[in-house]
Amino acid sequence: MTASQTTIFEHMSGLARELGAINLGQGFPELPEPPELIAAAQRALGERSNQYPPMRGLPELRGAVAGYYARTQGLELTADNVIVTSGGTEALAASLFALVAPGDEVLLVQPLYDAYLPLVQWAGGVAKVISLVPPQWTLPLEALKVAIGPKTRGIVLNTPNNPVGTMLSRETLEAIGALAEAHDLWVLCDEVWEAMVFDGTPHVSPLAIPSLAQRSVKVGSAGKIFSMTGWKVGWAVAAPELAARIAGRHQFLTFTTPPALQWAAAEGLAMPDTWFAAQRARYRALKARLVSGLEAAGFVVLPASGTWFVTIDLAASGLPADDVVLSERLVREAKVASIPVSAFYAERPETGFLRLCFTKDEAVLDKAVARLAAFRARLG
């Protein structure tokens, strides 16, 4: 993607607005936002400073991030490990600008979030791409090993994976750790969906793997954890020396993040585990509702552990395996917007899968399923 290109998310959302379609494409919730977070932000706006906060982030939020990961993932961190950024994407950018030198090769795993490739390129790096193997979307470790060359300096990972929702196991991360140690590689892991896991699969961060802990960067997002994507509050977590390098790039990107939102995120991360469990249960029920409706209509939905998305296998569903063409037809003819999974590929795309977002009201999901079922019936 060039800097002037429109992303597939903006394209499909624009079509949805223009055509009055249900938007199951772009990943944002259409549900009531957490009142606790709104109230915390309002208090902070009225009672606390609205001037520049510290460049690395408010100490309270950095400490809250460390405490949250200690509680939920058993990571031993302090505020010195945390750099607050304006969203997870800025954390990715600051990290890659800190880690990549011109000519460095960086391994990317596709399907991938669309920011990875341009950020590597803007840092002067050269991307080498490894593909997950559908329909289980497994990471081929042998292909990863073969891709490592004398110019390889790092690997970008994503768990849970957007768009397909699969997760990297501890065993897989340990194997990656052995490769990283052998070749002196850094690992940048996009973990923004870590709180959105619905089947009991444990989320494992590279920071929890001894061979990776000192050479990895973890990217997180308050927008995803609290389902408030417009807040754009994120963070990078790394060993102090790595964190300092990332901070050096962050200061020339956004410098800092709105303080009221940082205060609110800090309060949110300290909420009891029951709050987070209730949020997951709500989304788990919405996912089950969409999946059961799609399956009843004859669509084959692939298993996924996390994220806000489900993936339809087009060929297995008896549909034409051209996801770009089908997604355009769906938004225009069925009035339901989706995202073609091929849009998440840098090269050699898989074209037989569509991504749908389930974080919508039950009635909206039911209406979308009815429209998709009618479209499928018309195809015969």
Q: Which stretches of residues belong to each language-model region?
A:
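Structural signature of PLP-dependent enzymes
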Residues: R245-H250, G268-G293, L319-P320
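PLP-dependent enzyme catalytic core of the Aspartate aminotransferase-like
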Residues: G67, R329-S338, F344-G380
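Conserved PLP-anchoring active-site segment centered on the Schiff-base-forming lysine
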Residues: A98-V120
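Active-site PLP attachment segment
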Residues: I209-R245, T257
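N-terminal small-domain helix-loop-helix segment of the aminotransferase-like
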Residues: T2-G87, A94, A143, A270-M271, ...
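Conserved glycine-rich beta-strand-loop-beta hairpin in the small C-terminal domain of fold type I
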Residues: A266, A281-V291, V301-L314
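Helix C-cap/helix->beta junction micro-motif
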Residues: L19, A123, A182-H183, A297, ...
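Active-site phosphate-binding strand-loop segment of PLP-dependent enzymes
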Residues: L132-T201
